[in-house]
């Protein structure tokens, strides 16, 4: 006979066995994760007990209601993952990394509660639609994470009740702000080679159905070692270097093909214009069909209490947009309806002059011409160009080596080769050196679908001067 998967022999007291099985299951919790498979936590291990208690707080459960990829679900049908699943994943990767690092640096084990709690809570301050509204409304989710950790919250009470490590909340805030010593502990959670990026590249790639973010996670983790003298983490060996190079190219591809996908840009711009209209109407004392106080204060840039901020999530924001479909203002009503029904704006890349750099004066002139022509066309369709036309720019570096002049220079990826050479990655790798020096800035025209057929004509018109100059040159040659 089997009870809970355990064979019971004749004569054994079943009641006692059932009690033992129950105690085992009560102590352990398993999260079935599509990326990391079984994430098992055990209450008998202090750091894992802390994690379990933090997961059960209302502040952390809120992350279930915030999309990891903002509005990317409009572009990729599977992009429905939450900040909750990502945060649990980051904690799990951090735990794996500690296991690897402690083989040569046993002292890191005493920091396990701090590292795991920091990894778990690093994103607890995200607002509705994650980074999308953060960029639109100019707030800092990391600052909100610190306020939630240090405020009058369930998270703070769990941290204060963890007697194995006093002042844990203050230590986590310092670690997230990169003010904690030793500094390499912060690098585990936030750096150019951190557990946050490892998880989101794997997870976002999986959820969007793309292969760009695949990386050799275990090989990278095995190659990482602590250099206590330099207070940093280094990647050791040729195999580790190769895996890190692949990781950086994967990050580049994820930004180019997923995060900055043209439909994602259009969806973000659409939401930005919708919220811009809301803010304009608020200034005009418009009487909305619906608007709760925390949302009004948030959109207006007013100071929020932690409780007010915690009431904001994707569900609440989407409910507002649903209600605004019934609003009396025709522009807000139209933008809200288009957003809900995925009749979103479109986007097209504005091509720079032949051989011209994005930042030169000629290209700026082209962008301005394209925007002005589009505004005139939109106006002819009876739409307000202020809310139906935009220029979006994208630019990023998959790896940013240390620059002394930078205000907040990111940590280098340091390689220790098999021959003992220690160097910054881009100095050792020509391919990464080229990646660092590349120009990845692009400009995109955002416009309503009604004028889709006219957009190419607008681009040709903007480049007409260049075309005429080329033809004139060719004529002289002939």
Feature map (PLM): residue ranges:
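Elongated alpha-helical scaffolds
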Residues: 114, 119-120
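Short active-site segment of divalent metal-dependent hydrolases/proteases
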Residues: 121, 125-126
